[in-house]
Amino acid sequence: MFNWLEKVLNSAEKKGEKIYLLDHIPLYTSQHTYDCAIRLKVLLERYQHIISGYFSGHTHMDELTLVEEYHNDKKYSVINYICPSLTTYSDFWPSYRVYNADLKTKFVKDYTQWRLNLDETNKNDKPLWYISYKASQFYNVSDMNDYDIISKANIDYKYVKKTYADTPDNELMYNDQRVINRVKCEFNSNNYKELLECKNVDKGGEYYLHYVLNMLFKKWPKNE
C-alpha cells in the first residue's frame, strides 16, 4: 500500500500537481500499528509541499491533529482534518463540513461545520441543520494553515462539546477533567503509542493488545 501511495505522490510531484489525501483511520487510533503510522508520517513529511489537505474519519468525532515531521518533532508537516459523520449515533449529532480552499494553492483556508439538531428535527418532523462553528473563528486563526493553532486551541468545555458534535446527551462529561485530558492527548498524538503514553495508561490489556498487533505485522526496515 505504501509503495503504491509513494508512487502516486511522486508522480504528482513530478507533474507539479497538488493533492488531497483521504484515508479512513486517523494516525493516533489503535487500528494503526506503530510502524504503519510512522511510515505514513514519513510520507506526509516528504510530500508536504504538494499535500493541500489531509482528511480522515472513523472516530465520528469532530477533531483535528497536527502531524509532526518525523525528523523534527518541533515542526509540523500537515494538519489532519478528522470529520464527524452523518451517522445518527446515539451520542453524536449528525454532521457535515464545507471546506473553503485557495484556488491557486488548493490549501484549506477554512471550513464551516454543520450539525443536525436531532431533538428539534424529531419534534418538527423535518431536518433542522445549523452552523456549529466556523473553524478560523473557533481556533482563532486567520486561516487553517496557521500551525500556531496548537498553542491557540483552548481545550475546555467548549472544545470538548465540539469534539462530541454538540450532542446534549454528553453534557455531564464535557467538564470532566478526565475527558478533557483525553481530548488533549488525541489533539497532540501522532500514533497510538504516543496516545497511551499521554493518557498515562497502565500497561494493561489495551497496551498489550496493541503490542501484540504490532508484533504480528512485518516491521518497517529502518533504512527504507
Regions picked out by a protein language model, each given a short descriptive name:
Residues 1-78, 95:
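His/acidic metal-ligating clusters that form di-metal
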Residues 1-11, 61-224:
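Metal-dependent phosphoesterase/phosphodiesterase active-site architecture
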